Curated annotation (Swiss-Prot):
It catalyses: tRNA(Gly) + glycine + ATP = glycyl-tRNA(Gly) + AMP + diphosphate. It comes from the Bacteria. The keyword Nucleotide-binding applies. ATP binds at residues 207-209, 217-222, 291-292, 335-338. Coiled coil: none annotated. Keywords: Aminoacyl-tRNA synthetase, ATP-binding, Cytoplasm, Ligase, Nucleotide-binding, Protein biosynthesis. This is Glycine--tRNA ligase.
């Protein structure tokens, strides 16, 4: 019998099993902040490691960087964030609730059956006209008494130094990309990379979102995994397609079901003024389709802006033709937190067993599973041998050890945190140095020699 996969179930499991906790919990929390627990931080780190492996270590084109969160304010003036990084904000005059006007429009479109609803690129007048013409009501109180739409800048301000005046004002970065752009020449010079090449970064970003929500899907503090890939003008659309396919395959290799993802190509009127093409990979969350990964052709906009503002040369000299040009840039950008949420949702399963019992199981790909294996001694008398195996394996893998409760209950605990293989140390182990391995997904069991365990696990975690 099919089960309903809901966000309530995902959130409950995440809290109960140590994936994600509410932020500042003992003080009543802080809205839309979340802390990754012992299991969640392993999952998130594994997702980041997998991304870095495929986008940096296994790519002939790309190198990495780690830029400061705080940057010279001129960076954000040049990039357009100070003047233009805003969302359309409106308030309900009746209940004082605050909303993003574009999201109200998109939710209404979706409710009317529009397949790929989007109000990207709509100005305030067009948004207001749609809201008025369709008599869209406040989601909280049901009234239609809204304020005018105004633009709300999303950057967090703070102060640097001992004085709190306008000269000391500084921003928390709203994206990691600009640190890459301002370091383009440094990286190209020191790495001796030739176009085409990319610069990858994983790091925190901050946006004062008007309506965050849906668990970790939209938060004000989040982590990005971004690649800025620089190419010769005229080859950008070809590279845009290359990275679209690369990102798609990455998700499939790590176990995301193909029926749960789709491409949404931005229409011409949706595109940013500097974009030549943008495509999103959307994931089907329990609350509907949501953007997971954006792949944008940013042309030469960012490097040109920084060249004009800073006065520094951002051109590239082709060593073969001696032609000098500002490279175009393809940006595949994915939120680490959204990616983790997608993997959580995709992995979640409820299986009805013989006898009517239901087991909850997380079908993570072994490469991103928080624990690769769990060591389960059948009896306390076998603890010494079990610890020997545990200590042997944990030098190479993250391994759980559990000797409390019945073996059945221990299996269920490991199923709920997505451990792919449980290794049982039984009395036969003492005689022949073999162990029983239980497969999470099939629940089938088989015996393996202890000295073959490392190779077995290494093979299973490849992707």
């Amino acid at each position: 019998m099919p089960f309903e996969k809901t966000m309530d179930k995902i959130v409950a499991l995440a809290k109960n099993r140590g994936f994600v906790y509410p932020g500042s919990d003992i003080y009543g929390g802080l809205a839309n902040t979340w802390d990754y627990g012992p299991i969640g931080v392993e999952l998130k780190n594994n997702v980041k490691k997998a991304w870095w492996q495929k986008f940096v270590h296994e790519s002939q084109y790309n190198v990495g960087i780690d830029c400061a969160i705080l940057m010279n304010n001129e960076v954000w003036v040049a990039s357009g964030h100070v003047g233009n990084f805003s969302d359309p904000l409106m308030d309900c005059k009746e209940c004082k609730s605050r909303f993003r006007a574009d999201k109200l429009v998109e939710e209404h479109m979706t409710s009317k059956g529009v397949e790929k609803a989007s109000a990207d690129g709509w100005n305030n007048e067009k948004l207001k006209e749609y809201i008025d013409d369709n008599n869209i009501v406040c989601p909280d109180c049901g009234k239609t008494n809204f304020t005018d739409i105004r633009q709300f800048n999303l950057m967090f301000k703070t102060f640097q130094g001992v004085t709190e005046d306008s000269k000391a004002e500084i921003y928390l970065r709203p994206e990691t990309a600009q640190g890459i752009f301002v370091n383009f020449k440094n990286v190209q010079r020191t790495s001796r990379k030739k176009i085409p090449f990319g610069i990858a970064q994983i790091g925190k970003a901050f946006r004062n979102e008007i309506t965050p929500g849906n668990f970790t899907f939209r938060t004000r503090e989040f982590e990005q995994m971004e690649l800025e890939f620089f190419c010769e003008p005229g080859t950008d659309l070809e590279w845009h397609n290359y990275w679209k396919e690369y990102c798609w395959k990455f998700l499939l290799k790590l176990g995301i079901k193909e029926e749960n993802i789709r491409f949404r190509v931005h229409e011409k009127e949706e595109l940013s003024h500097y974009s030549n093409a943008t495509s999103d990979i959307e994931y089907l969350f329990p609350f509907g389709w949501g953007e997971l990964w954006g792949i944008a052709d940013r042309t030469d906009y960012d490097l040109t802006q920084h060249q004009n503002r800073s006065g520094k040369d951002m051109t590239y000299l082709n060593p073969v033709t001696n032609e000098r040009y500002i490279p175009y840039c393809i940006e595949p950008s994915v939120g680490a937190d959204r990616a983790v949420l997608a993997f959580l949702v995709d992995a979640y399963d409820e299986e009805e067993l013989e006898g009517g019992d239901v087991r909850t199981v997380m079908h993570f790909h072994p490469a991103i599973a928080p624990f690769k294996v769990a060591i389960l001694p059948l009896s306390k008398k076998l603890s010494e041998k079990a610890l020997d195996v545990y200590n042997m394996l944990r030098k190479d893998f993250n391994v759980d050890y559990d000797d409390a409760g019945s073996i059945g209950k221990r299996y269920r605990r490991e199923d709920e945190i997505g451990t792919p293989y449980c290794i049982t140390i039984d009395f036969d182990t003492m005689d022949n140095d073999t162990v029983t391995i239980r497969d999470r997904d099939t629940m089938k069991q088989f015996r393996v020699k202890i000295d073959e365990l490392k190779d077995f696990i290494k093979e299973k975690i490849q992707f």
